[in-house]
Amino acid sequence: MLFFADRSPFVRPLSGYAPVTPAAPRSTGSAAAPPPSPAVLDDRSGTEGDVTPMMAQYLAVKAAHPDCLLFYRMGDFYEMFFEDAVKAAETLDIALTKRGRHAGADIPMCGVPIHSHEGYLSRLIRAGIKVAICEQMEDPAEARRQRGYKAVVRRDVIRVVTAGTLTEDELLDARAHNYLAAVVRLRDAVGMAWVDVSTGDLVAQPLAEADIGPALARLAPGEVLMPEKLAGDPALREILAPLAGRISPLPASRFDSENARKRVEGLFGVKALDGFGGFGRAEVAAIGALIDYVELTQVGRLPRLSPPRRLSLGAILEIDGATRRNLELTETLGGGRKGSLLARIDCTVTGAGARLLAERLAAPLTDPAQIGARLDGVGFLVSAERVRGDLRDTLRGCPDIARALSRLSLGRGGPRDLAAIGEALSRIPALRVLVVGAGLGEPPTELTAALIDLGSHEGLVDLLGRALDADLPLLARDGGFIRPGYDAGLDELRALRDEGRRLIAGLQARYASETAIPALKIKHNNVLGYFIEVAAGRADKLMAAGGPFLHRQTLASQVRFTTVELSELEDKIRGAADKALALEQALFATLCAEVLGCAADIARAANGLACLDVAAALADLAARERYARPVVDNSTAFRIHKGRHPVVEAALADQAGPAFVANDCDLAPDQRLWLLTGPNMAGKSTFLRQNALIAVLAQMGSFVPAESAEIGVIDRLFSRVGAADDLARGRSTFMVEMVETAAILNQATERSLVILDEIGRGTATYDGLSIAWATVESLHDATRCRALFATHYHELTALASRLDRLSCHTLRIKEWKDQVVFLHEVGPGAADRSYGIHVAKLAGLPAAVIARAEQVLAILEKGDASSAATRLADDLPLFAAARPRAGLPTPPPGPHPLAEALNAINPDEMTPREALDALYRLKAVMKRE
């Protein structure tokens, strides 16, 4: 179909599916031509101010995709024009040139080569730009033969590439999911669905409105579809802010639940969706919007999608975005993977296994039975070192068949995808023997289910093994991938083709001999076909009148000829080669059909392989790092014996540092709230985080870094640890802290686990102390959850006398020769000092600053802080001169600290040792004075 005034029935604009007039391009340094209006599309004069037929075609395609940057295929390049060229040149840092003129101005143009376009495409997608790929739908030479020399090649959009619909390995992280999500609000119900187009996994979940943010934080989707009204809801502005650039608003009509239900039922061939789960209207609308959008971007095609799964409310441990960041579950605060919990525990050997592990870490379970089943699978392999090693060796390097299957279903797969599926399926018998025949008894249900999913695929493996050659091209159109002997007809055509090539070589030798030009060559290109090439200085020999050589082309240093004999031979070769390639394409289509006919079974096998990989990886981690199996039940216990921080422990080991100090944590019913005090750098934040991470690991189904752990299921995990401002939204560090604390106090339940660090810092001392005090009381009296609260406000320890479930604990230190040694041990009690000046000294503050700080601290510790601060200010000439003193009463001097210390001593009741200690204390007081 030629694009002029008409357009493809499959091509619809992405933004509401209604064409809009493209915006004018940005300045390029000189006046750039704006796109012509559709009124000139049929004017083919090509004069300045009008458009050529080719440009008319471009503008028709662009008008159908106004919100996409258009990759317009021209030969070996994807070209961009007008405002697209300006945007692409700026984003990709490539040269901006021009092609023709319109309305008295140059038309901006830039391009990227076809053979390396994936890298440029990836950069555009990361910049939040959607790209429509417009391909040539016919051979240019064929177009000229059929419709004349000036014929415009037929082009059509074959795909719209967006951040949530990627399928190519070059554009994806093999070890991470790439989700396309949809969020819908229908009346008072909120539903969310998500799909990984590269694997076909499709899931839906009902949500409370307050859980939209945590759910999106859990998925970290590449793209989110939302009704325009919901996307613009001021109440969701804060929730959606982290997803800026990834929201795709669509008209409300795309989220009609009744149309969606019919669409989904038709797609999966069922009369009702009840068999997949009790989906609500909002969930069905979200699923339907996803399917419609995927079909739109794939221009009428759909990947193989699994039947939708339903994730019920309360099925997973809810963790909000702030907590995920603070705990660095999947990436560090700096945005990198290294140093995160995921990087620490990821010992998987396949891409699918890595994705499943990340999925489980992001969404820990809340059902003790399901958690126990996962732990059984890990435990089975922990105790079987040889089986575990052989299992991992067999899985290592196993191809990613889920993504290969998705590409084949979209018509974008190649011979290597077929080979990948055959290779992975061929390993299944060995894996089954390893697990079942290991002599370890009946495998637990988790591993048994994985083995059932693996299935049996001997017939398909045999077919692919017989059909595919060892050395495979990337694309089927390149040919040469069918193994010799698989198809007799193909073998015959290849023999004819290869014989023709041998005849070409003989003809070249004969012509070189007859003309006495040893350098004469017979070459081939896509324009001239086969031709004879000689140096320009020897061309006269071939141009003799009456000779067999016919001139074809003159270049700067070569001249090209043909002969009738060569042309006839070329026709024979081309015929055989074309027929061989056509037959090979037909065989490829047949093989694809065979594979896609088994798509559901192959998808289950992919899931089984991933489950085995995750179980073996977690078992290997547990055995190597001395992790223990946790007990997870429906109680409210939280009892960790000798727990360790998994990431910090590994970092210390990598740096050959000291061994990590393990600590206990028991949030028993009579001490559900721990108030943790201790010096700076003693390890309070590490202790808080390690207990939260142990809880996450336990509920995802992993062994944990501890000697033992007993955890009653946690429904929500909250963390307020670390300090960071949010200047983009006008938030100070203190404001960010208060927002996160408010979320905790408003959303935590009795089953939640809360860790809070330094609540109240960043404002006046008494303000901060008051907020921290009230927060502790609220956690104790109102929320009644399990909580760890770290603070430097030592005054809070007084709450232990009246809050019966609050227990004070501290990080121990040892003072030795004016030095402070951090023991990193947690024990009962309360700290009386924070040793901040000591930490400042370690940080390298100037000696004069340290000395003055010690002097100020001594004065402040003597009595009332406000009067001490006044005295300190009076010591400074500026303040002393500025503050009038006349008429102000002078407060009576207080008792001298040394006199107070002496008055407190009763020598008659002291042992010799106590007397000696008292003398040392008096000397210390004298030094301070």
From Swiss-Prot:
Taxonomic superkingdom: Bacteria
Gene Ontology molecular-function annotations: ATP binding; ATP-dependent DNA damage sensor activity; damaged DNA binding; mismatched DNA binding
SMART domains for this protein: MUTSac, MUTSd
Binding-site positions, ATP: G678, P679, N680, M681, A682, G683, K684, S685
Keywords: ATP-binding, DNA damage, DNA repair, DNA-binding, Nucleotide-binding
GO cellular component: cytosol
Function: This protein is involved in the repair of mismatches in DNA. It is possible that it carries out the mismatch recognition step. This protein has a weak ATPase activity.
Region (Disordered): 22-46
Name of this chain's protein: DNA mismatch repair protein MutS
SUPFAM superfamilies in the record: DNA repair protein MutS, domain I, DNA repair protein MutS, domain II, DNA repair protein MutS, domain III, P-loop containing nucleoside triphosphate hydrolases
Biased composition (Low complexity): 23-32
Chain segments annotated as coiled-coil in the UniProt record: none
Xref: PANTHER family: DNA MISMATCH REPAIR PROTEIN MSH1, MITOCHONDRIAL, DNA MISMATCH REPAIR PROTEIN MUTS FAMILY MEMBER
Gene Ontology biological process terms in this record: mismatch repair
UniProt family annotation: Belongs to the DNA mismatch repair MutS family.
NCBIfam families the record matches: mutS1, PRK05399.1
